[in-house]
From Swiss-Prot:
One of its GO terms (molecular function) is ubiquitin binding. SUPFAM superfamilies: WD40 repeat-like. This is Mitotic checkpoint protein bub3. InterPro entries: WD40/YVTN_repeat-like_dom_sf, WD40_repeat_CS, WD40_repeat_dom_sf, WD40_rpt. Keywords: Cell cycle, Cell division, Mitosis, Nucleus, Repeat, WD repeat. Belongs to the WD repeat BUB3 family. WD repeats lie at residues 15-54, 56-94, 96-135, 138-177, 237-276, 279-327. Pfam families: WD40.
Length: 331
């Protein structure tokens, strides 16, 4: 049996000074976008472990995305949506929501920016035009999480009322589907499958649901849910929220991070857990794989699931996956 390490990790220097809300790799790059409750949006060169640039909001930044080298988008707790071009060094206001912007996603295939807010609104923006806001959709409940598939062009939105709304981004006049979450507790995170055929949904109740877009009975029979991020403490089963999901773009397997301070790798097709990474100092707030799927960024940042209390500092760990066996699907 080989004793060679399966992964190595290091901590990014000079992390944000408050909670880390999101981490996202720029495609085909070692550059990592980090948004924070300290009102900053930062970019780190993960290979050289240095911060490259930073811009600020007037309040805590809840989400961001880095779809192309000259396109960065971010949204804050006051409803402001910003666009930053790192190549030109130019920052501009895209528009705003009436309440906090919880989720920011960009579809590179259709060149569309989507923002979802606590004001219950889904907004579609065209950053190429002077009048950037194209459409506005009232989802009648706070938006908690969104993701878009560049393969199928499906936009998936999870709301506070435990519904999931699905749009085809090429036909935004009305939603394609609206379905009740198969998990009865609050949705924390939604991420689309790498093949574009469905999505994984994480909940506060230590459970993941694997769902499919195709409404036919044959395809819907494949959906399932499983328990995770649970510990037995003093003979009691303790359930932790699952905060984030990150799909490996190369293998289609995925990682989950929870308030139990753990990150696990899963093979969804074979319904198996592949690997457990190290236990972190505190809750896992966000994760992102690079395009090649051999680097995973992990934000260890207390998510206040137990209210205000002393907690470890906010940190970002970069994992180099040295052995494909911990992330490759089971044959």
């Amino acid at each position: 049996m080989s004793n060679e390490p399966t992964s190595s990790f290091y901590e990014l220097r000079l992390p944000p000074s408050d909670g880390i809300s999101s981490v996202n790799f720029c495609p085909n790059s070692v550059n990592l976008l980090v948004t924070s409750w300290d009102s900053t949006v930062r970019c780190y060169d993960t290979q050289n472990n240095v911060q490259k640039w930073q811009y600020n909001h007037k309040g805590p930044v809840m989400d961001g995305c880095f779809p192309e080298k000259n396109k960065v988008f971010s949204g804050d707790v006051f409803g402001s949506v910003k666009h930053y071009d790192p190549v030109a060094g130019v920052e501009k206001e895209v528009g705003s929501h009436e309440d906090g912007v919880r989720s920011v996603v960009y579809n590179s295939d259709t060149q569309q920016l989507f923002t979802g807010g606590w004001d219950q609104q889904l907004k579609l923006w065209d950053i190429r035009s002077d009048k950037m806001e194209i459409s506005n959709h009232d989802l009648q409940s706070k938006i908690f999480t969104m993701d878009v598939s560049p393969i199928s062009n499906m936009l998936v939105i999870g709301t506070a009322d435990k519904y999931v709304t699905i749009y085809d981004t090429r036909q935004m006049e009305t939603h394609l589907q609206k379905r009740e979450s198969s998990i009865k507790y609050q949705t924390r995170c939604i991420r689309t499958f790498t093949d574009g055929k469905g999505y994984a949904l994480a909940s506060v109740e230590g459970r993941i649901a694997m769902e499919y877009f195709d409404p036919s009975p044959a395809v819907q029979s494949k959906k399932y849910a499983f328990k995770c991020h649970r510990l037995t403490e003093s003979g009691v089963d303790v359930v932790y929220p699952v905060n984030c999901i990150a799909f490996n773009p190369h293998y289609g397997t995925f990682a989950t991070g929870g308030c139990d301070k753990n990150v696990f790798f899963w093979d969804g097709a074979n319904r198996k857990r592949l690997h457990a990474l190290k236990t972190y100092p505190t809750s896992i707030s966000s994760m992102s794989f690079n395009t090649d799927g051999n680097i995973l960024a992990v934000a260890s940042s207390y998510t206040f699931e137990e209210g205000e209390k002393d907690h470890p500092p906010d940190q970002i760990f970069i994992h180099n996956i040295l052995s494909e066996k911990i992330i490759k699907p089971i044959k």
